[in-house]
């Protein structure tokens, strides 16, 4: 299996193979997930001080905050998958 990487903004890159969900941070359950991850030292803040617009949840229970829209991250995820299938 080849490693696929997704740019989540400001030069930060995440392994696409480890992503479970890309969600918006506005709902109360997602805010609780962020708080729990912060308490467990499993939160990665990749916003560079900007407003959090996307929350990426990984299979290792790490939570990554990004300053770009969830739709943008999802589109990059899909493009990455399509690019790999074209190469094979």
Swiss-Prot record:
InterPro entries: RemA-like (IPR007169). Disulfide bonds: none annotated. It comes from the Bacteria. Pfam families: RemA-like. PANTHER family: REGULATORY PROTEIN SSL2874-RELATED, REGULATORY PROTEIN TM_1690-RELATED. HAMAP family: RemA (MF_01503). Belongs to the RemA family. This is Putative regulatory protein asr0105. It comes from Nostoc sp. (strain PCC 7120 / SAG 25.82 / UTEX 2576).
């Amino acid at each position: 299996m080849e490693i696929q990487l997704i740019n989540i903004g400001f030069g930060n890159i995440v392994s696409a193979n480890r992503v479970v969900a890309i969600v918006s941070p506005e709902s109360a359950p997602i805010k609780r997930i962020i708080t729990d991850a912060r308490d467990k030292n499993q939160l990665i803040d990749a916003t560079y001080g900007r407003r959090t617009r996307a929350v990426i949840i990984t299979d290792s229970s790490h939570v990554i905050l990004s300053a770009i829209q969830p739709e943008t991250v999802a589109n990059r995820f899909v493009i990455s998958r399509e690019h790999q299938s074209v190469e094979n």
